[in-house]
């Protein structure tokens, strides 16, 4: 297992170097070494590295780790292999918040769009929690159904906003944001979401033992001393903080939170707290790879969700086939 973690870590580092190097303005490995060594480098190269490529690469790693960890956690606590970061309405709420900001504030105000996305995702999860509380049920299926309801409401409002939006500016901005991109990443945006991301990630890692036990039935969890209600609420709060901060900068990224946990389980042949960590690492590699392909496959940069979907579908098909053989 240490060798496997070392191999995945090496793959992430290689992908990170490639991510820094590729683009319209080429940066070589020697340039990267010179910058880190404090040697003399062309001003344009240094500026592109520090203000564009490095923040973008770090943001891609953060997004992959966050979505992978959140997807793994959701699949465990909801006991649903199809659970992903949008299962409880985070993605739908963030999308709605961004759409409202685009229509009401400005299509060019990235701060307003990012803020709208974050608070929209947070509000969606609060609505899910209130809906679950109103039903007086704490079963995992209730959380999933509440998330579906909130997502449906969010999509309906977004469709209405699109119908009345300016087709040349607002509609195009909404569609582009929904497909996800790292092209708008800056150092200031990265630093602004880093504390929220770290709080969410560290919180989940501290609870990983309780999360692992939650793969058992509720009665078994209680017998083992797991306090289901507070632990589940804490996990949802931490994951919302983490995923919401990511989506607020990158827009929606499809499939990453779904395929990373499945790939991690296929690699480790188990489903425990170690899988949560591996899911984050796999997610980082997948998103980094998708971002690299988004920049090199076409003259114009492709939306990130197109690439994560292209990468994710074959993995899910393979998972479906292997599950079918196991149950046959």
What are these regions (language model features)?
Residues 1-328:
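Alpha-helical transmembrane segments in inner-membrane proteins
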């Amino acid at each position: 297992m240490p060798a496997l973690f070392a191999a995945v870590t090496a793959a992430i580092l290689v992908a990170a170097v490639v991510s820094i190097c590729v683009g319209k303005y080429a940066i070589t490995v020697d340039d990267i070494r010179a910058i880190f060594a404090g040697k003399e480098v062309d001003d344009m190269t240094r500026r592109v590295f520090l203000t564009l490529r490095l923040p973008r690469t770090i943001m891609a790693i953060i997004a992959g780790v966050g979505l992978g960890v959140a997807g793994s956690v959701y699949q465990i606590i909801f006991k649903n292999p199809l659970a992903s970061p949008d299962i409880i309405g985070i993605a739908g709420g963030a999308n709605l918040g961004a759409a409202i900001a685009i229509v009401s504030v400005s299509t060019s105000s990235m701060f307003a769009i990012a803020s709208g996305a974050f608070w929209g995702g947070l509000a969606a999860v609060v609505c899910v929690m209130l809906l679950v509380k109103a039903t007086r049920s704490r079963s995992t299926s209730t959380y999933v159904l509440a998330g579906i309801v909130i997502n449906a409401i969010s999509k309906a409002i977004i469709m209405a906003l699109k119908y009345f939006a300016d087709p040349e500016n607002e509609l195009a901005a909404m569609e582009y944001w929904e497909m996800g991109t790292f092209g708008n990443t800056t150092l200031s945006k990265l630093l602004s979401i880093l504390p929220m991301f770290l709080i969410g990630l560290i919180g989940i890692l501290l609870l990983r033992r309780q999360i692992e036990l939650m793969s058992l039935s509720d009665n078994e969890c209680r017998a083992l001393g797991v306090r289901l209600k507070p632990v589940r609420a804490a996990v949802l709060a931490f994951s919302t903080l983490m995923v919401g901060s990511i989506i607020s900068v990158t827009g929606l990224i499809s499939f990453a939170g779904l395929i990373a946990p499945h790939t991690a389980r296929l690699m480790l042949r188990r489903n425990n707290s170690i899988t949560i960590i591996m899911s984050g690492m796999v997610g980082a590699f997948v998103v980094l790879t998708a971002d690299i392909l988004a920049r090199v496959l076409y003259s114009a940069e492709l939306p990130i969700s197109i690439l994560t979907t292209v990468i994710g579908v074959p993995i899910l098909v393979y998972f479906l086939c292997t599950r079918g053989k196991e149950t046959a």
